[in-house]
Amino acid sequence: MNNTEFSKIAETTIAYIADKIEEQDKEASIDVDLQGDILNLDTDKGIYVINKQSAAKEIWLSSPVSGPYHFFYEQGKWKNKIGLELMAILTEELNIKFDNI
């Protein structure tokens, strides 16, 4: 995947995460702040940071619950080196249903 393709997929994914949270968080318990390529989620568990790392062609997640992760894009999913999926981690920790996009 070239840099342009990576940027488009990563930016679409991060925007999708922000949109899904705002759509499903009926109590507005998660403060969503998307600034460029950086998504901050302020929750009662702490602050999540999701951002794109262009040089590595990865999305990075910093979770106050489970720690840091680096995800690469493979077969339509963002996975880390041991096979954990970005959307699965977010679904479990935030109680928001994400589909793979």
UniProtKB/Swiss-Prot annotation:
GO molecular function annotations of the record: 2 iron, 2 sulfur cluster binding; ferric iron binding; ferrous iron binding; ferroxidase activity; iron chaperone activity
Record's GO cellular component terms: cytoplasm
Gene Ontology biological process: intracellular iron ion homeostasis; iron-sulfur cluster assembly
Keywords: Iron, Metal-binding
InterPro entries: CyaY (IPR047584), Frataxin/CyaY (IPR002908), Frataxin/CyaY_sf (IPR036524), Frataxin_CS (IPR020895)
SMART domains for the chain: Frataxin_Cyay
PROSITE patterns for the chain: FRATAXIN_1, FRATAXIN_2
General function of this protein: Involved in iron-sulfur (Fe-S) cluster assembly. May act as a regulator of Fe-S biogenesis.
Family: Belongs to the frataxin family.
Protein name (Swiss-Prot/TrEMBL): Iron-sulfur cluster assembly protein CyaY
Organism, scientific name: Rickettsia felis (strain ATCC VR-1525 / URRWXCal2) (Rickettsia azadi)
